[in-house]
Amino acid sequence: MGASLNEIKTKIASTKKTSQITGAMQMVSAAKLQKAESHAKAFQTYAEKVRKITTDLVSSDNEPAKNPMMIKREVKKTGYLVITSDRGLVGSYNSNILKSVISNIRKRHTNESEYTILALGGTGADFFKARNVKVSYVLRGLSDQPTFEEVRAIVTEAVEEYQAEEFDELYVCYNHHVNSLVSEARMEKMLPISFDEKGDEKASLVTFELEPDRETILNQLLPQYAESMIYGSIVDAKTAEHAAGMTAMRTATDNAHSVINDLTIQYNRARQASITQEITEIVAGASAL
C-alpha cells in the first residue's frame, strides 16, 4: 500500500509541473494573441484604404481595365498557397485547413498536373511531402508577428508564377481568426483580382487626370495590391494560430487540474485504507493478548 501511495504522490507532483508549464504557455500565447490582434486590426485599416484606392482607379474609366492580373483565363492549372504553423501544440489549427485543402483538391482535380502548392509553414510542407504531393515552394520559420519582408519571397513567387501563367488562378488557404475560441478554414481566390464595385464608389476618380495613363499605373499597382492582400491573409492566419495555441494550452491546463483532483481523491482513499488497515491490525494484536 505504501508503494502505491508514493506512486500516486509522484504522479500528482509530475502533473502539477505539467500544469505549470501549460499554464505559462497559455499566458505567453495570450500575450502573443493580443499583439497579433492589434497588428491585424491595423493592417485591416490599411488594406481597406488600399482596396478603396485601387477600386476607384479601376473604375475611373468607362472602359474595363485590361490588366492581365484582372482578366479571367481558361483554368488549366490552379495554385494553392497553404498557410500552416511551423510547430504543434495548436489544437486542430493545422488539421482543419489541411483537410479542407485535400478535400478540395480531390473534388476539383483528377491529377497533379492540374494544381501546384506553395506551402507557408513547416507543418503543411511536411504533410504534403509525406503524401508525395509536389510542393513548388516552401517557406518556414516565420516569427510570431511576421513582417512583409519575412514573407516577401513566397508572396512574390505566387504573384510572379501567376503572371508567368504557370497557373491560372490562385487560392490562399488559411484559418481565419474569428475570436479567441473560434477560427474557420478559408480558401480565398486572390488571383485573378476581382473587385465588387458598389454604385456609390464608382466614378469617384472620373474627374481626375491620371499621369501616366491608367493602364500603366495598374501595371505597377495591381501586383503590389495582390501581394498586400495575400500578406493580410498571413497576418490573419498567424492571429488564429496564437488563439489556437492559447486555447490548446488552456484545455491542457484544465485537464491537468482535473487529473490532479482525481489523483488527490485516489491518494486520500488509499491513505484512508492504509490507516484503517493499520488500526485493524493493532486491534487484532491487542485482542490476541
From Swiss-Prot:
Gene Ontology CC entries for this record: plasma membrane; proton-transporting ATP synthase complex
Location in the cell: Cell membrane
Superkingdom of origin organism: Bacteria
Membrane topology, record value: Peripheral membrane protein
Keyword Glycoprotein appears in the UniProt entry: no
Annotated function: Produces ATP from ADP in the presence of a proton gradient across the membrane. The gamma chain is believed to be important in regulating ATPase activity and the flow of protons through the CF(0) complex.
Protein name: ATP synthase gamma chain
Organism of derivation: Lactococcus lactis subsp. cremoris (strain MG1363)
Organismal lineage: Bacteria, Bacillati, Bacillota, Bacilli, Lactobacillales
Gene name in the database record: atpG
